[in-house]
Amino acid sequence: MAKQITSICSFIFGASDKKSLPDESAPEIAFAGRSNVGKSSLINLLINSKKAARVSSKPGCTRQINFYSMYNDKFRIVDLPGYGYSCASKEEAVQYLNLIEYYLIHRRNLKRVFVLIDSKVGLKEIDKDFVYWLICNNINFNIVLTKIDKVNQESLNAILENTQKWVNNEHVSIHQISIRVKHKITKVRDEFFKFTR
């Protein structure tokens, strides 16, 4: 299946404003998180590709919502601009934030948001603000702890427990992922494809 996945993923385009958002004809799964948390890398891992998702050379410099078509547009992957750090001006950063909020609230074909948290630092206030905003707006999401190979098991357990306690929602799955741990990737991939049906 992995070989098939790579060949049927294609970049559609990047939307930099509300008017350029594509139609809502296909289910969409979005990926969100702080800048440099590894969104594009996770997307590439899930679809078994090294370069399907575009990676910015500078963290915080992705200024558009990137859409990727899967299986001839049977569903789409959506890579949201990172929050928390930006090489844009304050005015531009506000525009991107407004675009993200508009997309998440009004997108009727959005099935799930995967929120990525860097295991090296755990939940930061900006992550909590974003997750709380999702909860307040009744937007379904899962959490993925990234870069777990960069922390020891004790620290990872503490971060996982803290995240579970803070989210306090049995319907929110919390996953752990590392490019070095294959079975972790498989679990997240299975969860990911569950929402494409």
UniProtKB/Swiss-Prot annotation:
Query: Where in this chain does the record put each EngB-type G domain?
Result: 25-197
Q: Which CDD domains does the record associate with it?
A: YihA_EngB
| List of residues binding GTP | 33-40, 60-64, 79-82, 146-149, 177-179
The superkingdom of the source organism is Bacteria
Residues that coordinate or bind Mg(2+): S40, T62
Asked whether the UniProt record includes Cell cycle among its keywords, one would answer yes
Instruction: List, in alphabetical order, the GO biological process terms annotated in this UniProt record.
Output: division septum assembly
GO MF annotation: an example? metal ion binding
For this UniProt record, give its keywords in alphabetical order, as a comma-separated list: Cell cycle, Cell division, GTP-binding, Magnesium, Metal-binding, Nucleotide-binding, Septation
* Pfam families per the UniProt record, alphabetical: MMR_HSR1
- Name any cofactors this protein relies on: Mg(2+)
Summary of the function given for this chain in its UniProt record: Necessary for normal cell division and for the maintenance of normal septation.
Return the similarity comment. Answer: Belongs to the TRAFAC class TrmE-Era-EngA-EngB-Septin-like GTPase superfamily. EngB GTPase family.
Which NCBIfam families does the UniProt record give?
GTPase_YsxC
Q: What is this protein called?
A: Probable GTP-binding protein EngB
Could you tell me which species this protein originates from? Wolbachia pipientis subsp. Culex pipiens (strain wPip)
The record lists the lineage as: Bacteria, Pseudomonadati, Pseudomonadota, Alphaproteobacteria, Rickettsiales
